[in-house]
Amino acid sequence: MATTISTQRGQVYIGELPQDFLRIMPTQQQQQVQLDAQAARQLQYGGSLGTAGRLSITVVQAKLAKNYGMTRMDPYCRIRLGYAVYETPTAHNGAKNPRWNKVIQCTVPPGVDSFYLEIFDERAFSMDDRIAWTHVTIPENLREGTVVDEWYSLSGRQGDDKEGMINLVMSFATIPAGMMMQPQPVVLMPTVYQQGVGYVPIAGVPGMYNQGVVPMGMPAAAPVASQSAPCSEEDLKALQDMFPNLDKEVIRTVLEAQQGNKDAAINSLLQMAEEL
């Protein structure tokens, strides 16, 4: 109900102010930007809490069908797995036979069973040129502790599976159950801008639910006795002496994938050495 207040200029009637007084209603596009930003923050805070495991990808080498450079070609690889993007160093003057021997450690989100790989030619004075690409399905037997060493066909300007091949060595490590947290639904509330206050939730408007991960503390996991011997520096050095042509990080990755089993690691490294 309106009230009357006396001022120097006379009586003034003051009524109830509407709920949207001095508020700027955002457009649908602005609301979507806010929701996307909140979802991105939740994903960032969540980190690897919702991951199913860790995938190790060793990008060894590639045999390309054509040199697309004017004088030389400097290829590098880009891998997209889930929301993450990884890159190898540039193989300077690698041309049609680039070698990287780069080990990439990826966290695998639940439900993700493949990744996308692209090869680019690094350019100095123009945009990097995409040479080849392929879609790789993560082998099921990786979860059994095996190491997969395969050549995958590349697609490109020459046609599907006609741009050459790339050699990848993959292993998988499962994250202990005590270190994983189930993702919880996150409520994303539509907001409006209120002058002097900022963005505030809109009363009476239902929130949108997003299956993100909320920031939370990691539970203290009880120490578990290791079932296999850890990778010792002596074993690593011995394997490095046996395979001097292989990169040290590649040997370390294979040894870790075999859970410190030196004999099994030697068999896997012998298969890799035969391909080189």
Curated annotation (Swiss-Prot):
Assigned GO CC terms: cytoplasm; early endosome
Positions occupied by motif AIM1: 133-136
Keyword Cytoplasm found: yes
Compartment annotation: Cytoplasm; Endosome; Early endosome
GO process annotations (BP): autophagy; inflammatory response; innate immune response; negative regulation of Wnt signaling pathway; phosphorylation; ubiquitin-dependent protein catabolic process
SUPFAM superfamilies in UniProt: C2 domain (Calcium/lipid-binding domain, CaLB), UBA-like
Cross-referenced CDD domains: C2_Tollip (cd04016), CUE_TOLIP (cd14363)
CUE domain: residues covered: 231-274
AIM2, short sequence motif: residues: 151-154
GO MF, any single term: ubiquitin conjugating enzyme binding
Top-rank taxon, per record: Eukaryota
Record-annotated membrane-spanning stretches: none
UniProtKB keywords: Autophagy, Cytoplasm, Endosome, Immunity, Inflammatory response, Innate immunity, Repeat
Domain characteristics, as noted in the entry: Both ATG8-interaction motifs (AIM1 and AIM2) are required for the association with ATG8 family proteins.
Subunit architecture: Oligomerizes. Interacts with ATG8 family proteins (via AIM motifs), and ubiquitin (via CUE domain). Found in a complex with TOM1; interacts (via N-terminus) with TOM1 (via GAT domain); the interactions leads to TOM1-recruitment to endosomes and inhibition of TOLLIP binding to PtdIns(3)P.
Function: Component of the signaling pathway of IL-1 and Toll-like receptors. Inhibits cell activation by microbial products. Connects the ubiquitin pathway to autophagy by functioning as a ubiquitin-ATG8 family adapter and thus mediating autophagic clearance of ubiquitin conjugates. The TOLLIP-dependent selective autophagy pathway plays an important role in clearance of cytotoxic polyQ proteins aggregates. In a complex with TOM1, recruits ubiquitin-conjugated proteins onto early endosomes. Binds to phosphatidylinositol 3-phosphate (PtdIns(3)P).
Name under which the protein is recorded: Toll-interacting protein
Protein species of origin: Danio rerio
